[in-house]
Amino acid sequence: MSRQWLFSTNHKDIGTLYFIFGVWSGMVGTSLSILIRAELSHPGMFIGNDQIYNVIVTAHAFIMIFFMVMPIMIGGFGNWLVPLMLGAPDMAFPRMNNMSFWMLPPSLTLLLSSSMVENGAGTGWTVYPPLSSGTAHAGASVDLAIFSLHLAGISSILGAVNFITTVINMRSSGITLDRLPLFVWSVVITAILLLLSLPVLAGAITMLLTDRNLNTSFFDPIGGGDPILYQHLFWFFGHPEVYILILPGFGMISHIITQESGKKETFGTLGMIYAMLTIGLLGFIVWAHHMFTVGMDVDTRAYFTSATMIIAVPTGIKIFSWLATLHGTQLTYSPALLWSLGFVFLFTVGGLTGVVLANSSIDIVLHDTYYVVAHFHYVLSMGAVFAIMAGFIHWYPLLTGMVMNPSWLKAQFSMMFIGVNLTFFPQHFLGLAGMPRRYSDFPDSYLTWNIISSLGSTISLFAVIFFLFIIWESMITQRTPSFPMQLSSSIEWYHTLPPAEHTYSELPLLSSNF
């Protein structure tokens, strides 16, 4: 047991560990979100303390980003699928792969500790000074959160190095870069973004750590520092981070839509690759659109507005290529395809509100209102999470060798779809009406939409529980697939379901007409 799970060097076992960890963290993060919506379901205090409320909001963000989406998408799907799609026997650095995983549980422990000692870190996930300074947040909470981020960051950087090396060096004969599966491309681009952005975050939070404990003044005006510097450093990481969260989802959706359409390949494969590369590149030069309210020059604001809008172009290319891939097929609405179609539609809606927020003059009004919350939850809660659900259902027979009940999955999709839209769509109206983020109380003019929003979150909670039940049911009944439904254009399906512990012991050769 300990050799298989504690000291594993097998990409499949490590990927499974990532999945288990991500699902567990996701349940913690979901519980926190239910607490937030319970507080906001009615005017007046429920938790009774704004500091505690902000600690819950901060922990919800950190857990969902660093311990749910990234471990499942990059660690879970990445580890499982990249070697199988490359025809590689394993990752390039199998032991480092194991270390990448085992840095995450200590990191999560540090984060949860930071919420439990002293007053907790009630800074929001951005951890802006002066609120996160030693004066406003005395005690160990913010320091523990910083150490947690350091560990999660090191884990991601090591994983990124591993994926890049694997894809460069371990492709089978015949898999040239232009024939690399789109999911593998998306993981490589994600890894490059991680490699370039995380060190900047590490620098920023290390400076914050020394400001708090070693009497430096990087972000303290009294000693000649500038809190705005922290914002620039943080968002230079933070904006690529949101593309890191969604890019592997793009890759998975491409595979699912292609295979469900019965097509040989995605429409415009090369265009899809260039679109992802462009999104990754542009993601690094738009960071200050998160800071339109800090008083930048008008020409700076004009630049960041236009640069942000340019990102909509490659994103649009991806959306329309997916629609073109679907074009002309007699669709069977399988659960994985339902999630993918939901992804395409809701991600587009989230992208449109993003274009609205890109206008610096409009953003002055909408900044730090629920409009922003609605925007990023549409792209994360209905982009990243829908992609995870689609991918998990699609590759579940490959991961486990079992099949889930498709009728239940469709019912569960309907529940979740209604739940998330009921939760986040009204938040656009709240934001336009000026309801600010990160406050636990609100005037009763906002009551109706908040009640509807909280009702939606309850529906989503039941949908998540239903999904766990569906997984449980599939595992106790042990239904096995008769044959893989997929086309031969995806080589991960050329195995027993689930694959043997060691696949590709003899390296495959891919012919030019696969």
UniProtKB/Swiss-Prot annotation:
Query: Please, which domain of life does this record's source organism belong to?
Result: Eukaryota
Q: What does the record give as cofactor? A: heme; Cu cation
| Enzymatic reactions | 4 Fe(II)-[cytochrome c] + O2 + 8 H(+)(in) = 4 Fe(III)-[cytochrome c] + 2 H2O + 4 H(+)(out)
Which pathway does it serve?
A: Energy metabolism; oxidative phosphorylation
Q: Which GO terms describe its molecular function?
A: cytochrome-c oxidase activity; heme binding; metal ion binding
Give binding positions for Cu cation. H239, H289, H290
Q: What is its EC number?
A: 7.1.1.9
Listed binding positions for Ca(2+) are E39, G44
What is known about its subunit structure? Component of the cytochrome c oxidase (complex IV, CIV), a multisubunit enzyme composed of a catalytic core of 3 subunits and several supernumerary subunits. The complex exists as a monomer or a dimer and forms supercomplexes (SCs) in the inner mitochondrial membrane with ubiquinol-cytochrome c oxidoreductase (cytochrome b-c1 complex, complex III, CIII).
By what name is this protein known? Cytochrome c oxidase subunit 1
